[in-house]
Amino acid sequence: MNTSLPRATAPFAGKTGRLVPESEGAPVPQVKAPTDAPNILVIILDDVGFGSFGTFGGPVPTPGLDLVAQKGLRYNRFHTTALCSPTRAALLTGRNHHAVHMGGIPEMANGFPGYDTIIPPEAATVAQVLRMNGYATGCFGKWHLTPMWEMGPGGPFDRWPTGMGFDRFYGILGAESSQYEPPVYDQTTPVSPHLGRENYHLTEDLVDQTINWIDRVSVSSPGKPFFCYLPTPAVHAPHHAPREWIDKFAGQFDAGWDAL
């Protein structure tokens, strides 16, 4: 796997002569991932405590996650900043959040070292590294890593997902949004996916978009691995749960968290 960013242009490997018969073209360079490169899916749920999941003995049943855990590994010791943007920045760059200028959230940016929320270009994301080594990359959900003054549809887009290694982006840029009428961006274009769709819910939309993208990559580029980053806005406030799920848990938490 290439470890230098950006990838250097390969020197000409053919030969040129005075005439065509004396010349030999070189193969057209194409970046391809290693044959054993795995697909990678990273799912982040916002503001969910370690003790909430049924997988770890919590009160919320999570059968899908339980199945994944049974077939993989469960970690019970980890460290985060307990803040949204710093944790995401550290996860995507592999660096301390202060080193990539994300000591707080973009809404609280200031001029002190490590807190201006301007991720420097030399801090490559895992998406940039993987894309330059033959991966398809997609981000679906909450980004929250763009400086506030760069969030408009007029750009600049350097620190939007599409400028930081993701071929495909569908989601929200900010900290929180309505699940029913969200300010969604498709790449860098603002869209209103809820219009004309009864019972629309952002989390369901994001999952559908993720599945569709993975299917398209698999069909259009067989054998090409993907890196998919799915940071859902849920369960961050505002807490807009679908009615069917509210009804499903009716009465179970009426006594409050102290009774659990």
What are the functions of these language-model segments?
Residues 1-260:
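Formylglycine-dependent sulfatase
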